[in-house]
Regions:
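Non-catalytic nucleic-acid-binding interfaces of large nucleic-acid enzymes and RNP effectors
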Residues: 1-170
Length: 170
């Protein structure tokens, strides 16, 4: 690989200016405040409750075993949700700081395979869907031709799920 070309590519990517997408920021913030599960956003784990204990738990071994299994499942779900919930909160904290800035840039790096990645891990153009949705180009440009629109439509259909691009009328 010609290193000057690689460096030029990285520098070009790093010149892209970003801003926080305010409507998406407000939506995610409201969902988090109201424990509303939307897409990949986790509910607040503190709102998850253990199943009620059966009235005959002391005398019915089968009921005790079943309740323990259900409670164990809830505890596991709480642990997984807590991890995701904390990650979303950290992303939102970054977005809160960045939303008051007129625009910002990402530093990028490349690995030994020459794949390019943004250095920040949480709020970046290559992280989770909700994180990417919080970002928008400061200076957007219209899509070029119908091929650009088709690629955009197919990507959106894939995110929606269960859509065969061969069946799309584009």
């Amino acid at each position: 690989h010609e290193m000057p070309v690689v460096y030029e590519s990285i520098n070009t990517i790093q010149e892209t200016e970003w801003v926080i997408n305010k409507p998406i920021f407000d939506l995610i913030k409201k969902c988090m405040e109201n424990d509303f599960n939307l897409g990949q956003l986790p509910v607040n784990p503190q709102s998850m409750e253990l199943p009620p204990k059966p009235f005959d738990i002391k005398t019915n071994k089968e009921a005790l075993t079943k309740w323990k299994r259900e409670a164990q499942h809830v505890h596991k779900s709480i642990g997984q949700a807590m991890s995701k919930f904390i990650q979303v909160r950290l992303v939102m904290e970054e977005a809160t700081v960045l939303q008051n800035i007129g625009g910002f840039f990402y530093p990028y790096q490349f690995d030994f395979r020459f794949r390019i990645y943004p250095k920040p891990a949480l709020l970046s153009p290559q992280s989770a869907d909700y994180s990417r949705a919080l970002l928008k180009f400061k200076f957007g440009k219209p899509m070029g031709n119908n091929d650009s629109y088709s690629v955009f439509a197919i990507a959106g259909a894939n995110l929606y799920g269960e859509v065969d691009k061969e069946e799309l009328p584009i």
